Swiss-Prot record:
Disulfide bonds: none annotated. GO terms for biological process: translation. Belongs to the universal ribosomal protein uS7 family. The keyword Metal-binding does not apply. It comes from the Bacteria. One of its GO terms (molecular function) is rRNA binding. Transmembrane segments: none annotated. PROSITE patterns: RIBOSOMAL_S7 (PS00052). This is Small ribosomal subunit protein uS7. InterPro entries: Ribosomal_uS7 (IPR000235), Ribosomal_uS7_bac/org-type (IPR005717), Ribosomal_uS7_CS (IPR020606), Ribosomal_uS7_dom (IPR023798), Ribosomal_uS7_dom_sf (IPR036823).
Length: 156
């Protein structure tokens, strides 16, 4: 059954320690099975570890990491006359942030440190310094968009 109106965007409650809405969104994405306290423990532990290991402001480093991972372009499939083209399109700001969060979490989970705290802090530090799997994912996305620039006139 279709909706009569578009669903309203819900306001995200800022996280308890830093009062940051984007960090709260990150926490919600990291969470499994509604276990928010576990996600909180992981994130705050990673922030503490970043502060001790690299002596940096963890919140600023987190935002730098997100900024470095956010893609500007992506490709979307467009079917034209029996052929499917990968058409490069600009990414909306909210989707850019969502993709960056998703990629950082996926890259952190794929790392081989012992605890998730260590993995997340390592990936955030790498992303803030333009290294790591999440940044590579963004570069691959941009490369794909650049390779398919010839089809950009199919944009919709």
């Amino acid at each position: 059954m279709s909706r009569r109106h578009r669903a309203e965007k819900r306001d995200v409650i800022p996280d308890a320690k830093y009062g940051d809405v984007i960090l709260a969104k990150f926490m919600n994405s990291l969470m499994y099975h509604g276990k928010k306290s576990a996600a909180e423990t992981i994130i705050y532990g990673a922030f503490d570890q970043m502060q001790q290991k690299a002596s940096v402001d963890p919140l600023r480093t987190f935002h730098e990491a997100l900024e470095n991972v956010m893609p500007a372009l992506e490709v979307r499939s467009r079917r034209v006359g029996g052929a499917t083209y990968q058409v490069p399109v600009e990414v909306r700001p909210d989707r850019r942030r969502a993709l960056a969060i998703r990629w950082i979490i996926a890259a952190a989970r794929a790392r081989n440190e012992t605890t998730m705290v260590a993995r997340l802090s390592g990936e955030l530090l790498d992303a803030a310094n333009n290294r790591g799997s999440a940044v590579k994912k963004r570069e691959d996305t941009h490369r794909m968009a650049e390779a398919n620039r010839a089809f950009s006139h199919y944009r919709w």
